[in-house]
Amino acid sequence: RRSFIEINAEFQKALHIMEETNRHVFITGKAGTGKSTLLEYFRHNTRKDVAVLAPTGVAALNVEGQTIHSFFGFKPSITPEKVKKISGPDAAIYKEFNTIIIDEISMVRADLLDCVEKFMRLNGPYRKQWFGGVQMVFVGDLYQL
C-alpha cells in the first residue's frame, strides 16, 4: 500500500459527493487509477456510517469488508422474490447506515443488485426511495471481467 495519497481534482470531487451528499456514486477506472485508495481514504475519514461489501470472499478480504450475501443474510439461491422484510435485533442495523460501498461491482450480477435494492427498500430507513434512501457507492472496472 502507498504511504501517501495524491489528492487531485477528481479525487476531491468524488470525496465531496460521497461525504457531503446522499447521491449514488459509480467510481470506475483502470487498474492503478486509485479506486481502492479512494475507497480506503473515504472509509477511514468519513463521518458517515459505512458498510464495505464485495461479491466474493477474496474481494471482501481485500477491502476489509463482508460479502454481499453475508451482510444481507442472503442464501446462494436468493432471488428478488425471496427478499423479505426482517424483524428482530438485526433489523435495526440496516437503518443505521448512511452509505454502502460495493467494490468489484463488475462481478455483481444484475439480479443480485435487484435483491440488494429490494432488501434496502424493505429494511432501510426510507421505503419509498431507491436502496431505502441509503447512499450506494459502486466501485470497479467494468472492462475487468
Give residue ranges: language-model regions.
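Conserved ATP-binding/catalytic motifs of P-loop helicase motor domains
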Residues: 1-145
